[in-house]
């Protein structure tokens, strides 16, 4: 059975003390680059090398347990149940935020104003030639908050793509770099847009690269976002199912049905506001 090395990042004495039992702490106490959030300690770990090819690795933020309701035992049990069949295992909460948007980039633009063009440019930088405007993502390939566990091969490609974004943001001197480093609204405060770009790279890899086999922990069994969409659990299920059907069969009727249902739901939400 493949071993799972699952880390919880800590950046203060308080978050160090809150590392959940069963997870290994990943030290970011020096927190040299808080502007990169979790990417900085994950990057340092991966660049150091020494990963076991048959093992799984995960790097969770201090908010993992609060956002998912999962402890280390349940995460590791899911890894064991998979039996090494998958390259990537997903633990994404907020099912409503997976089902309603066409993809995680649209979801990000809904949450962070004026970021869609930056997301698009970043996606094209990471995966040149990707048809960004036709990307459809669902619960089988959407990753929130870097809550995933994967084998080293996936992590290496993830790091390679993220480093393209990292290099542009660090070098500066372009409008794209400025927008990556620019703060956007987040949790009542602000965070650089590049943080939310990095959080979407795993989803992009899974949607664009069919070579990766992924399995998702049931997202409907994890906490939802608390948005107005949570009033419509049946419709959320239908929306996600239609996207999955479209991804597997490419019949345009599934995507048309998704947009029609989403449009009707949008009308209901607008009426509820008035």
Identify the residue ranges that each predicted region occupies:
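ER/Golgi luminal nucleotide-sugar-dependent glycosyltransferases, focusing on the catalytic module
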Residues: 1-274
């Amino acid at each position: 059975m493949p071993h799972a090395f699952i880390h919880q990042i800590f950046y203060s004495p308080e978050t160090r003390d809150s590392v959940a039992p069963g997870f290994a702490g990943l030290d970011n106490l020096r927190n040299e680059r808080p502007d990169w959030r979790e990417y900085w300690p994950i990057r340092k770990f991966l660049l150091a090398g020494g990963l076991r090819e048959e093992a799984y690795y995960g790097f969770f933020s201090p908010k993992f347990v609060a956002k998912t309701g999962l402890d280390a035992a349940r995460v590791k049990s899911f890894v064991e149940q998979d039996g090494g069949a998958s390259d990537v295992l997903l633990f994404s909460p907020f099912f409503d935020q997976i089902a309603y948007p066409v993809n995680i980039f649209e979801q990000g633009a809904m949450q962070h104003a004026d970021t869609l063009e930056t997301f698009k440019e970043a996606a094209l930088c990471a995966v040149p030639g990707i048809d960004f405007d036709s990307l459809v993502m669902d619960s089988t390939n959407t990753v929130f908050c870097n809550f995933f566990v994967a084998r080293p091969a996936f992590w290496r490609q993830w790091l390679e793509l993220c480093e393209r974004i990292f290099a542009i943001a660090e070098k500066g001197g372009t409008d794209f770099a400025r927008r990556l480093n620019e703060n956007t609204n987040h949790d009542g405060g602000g965070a650089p847009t590049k943080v939310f770009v990095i959080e979407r790279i795993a989803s992009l890899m899974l949607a664009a690269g069919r070579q990766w086999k992924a399995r998702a922990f049931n997202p409907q069994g994890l906490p939802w976002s608390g948005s107005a969409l949570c009033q419509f659990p049946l419709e959320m299920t239908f929306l996600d199912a239609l996207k999955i059907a479209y991804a597997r069969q490419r019949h345009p009727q599934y995507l048309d049905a998704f947009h029609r249902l989403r449009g009707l739901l949008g009308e209901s939400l607008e009426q509820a506001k008035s």
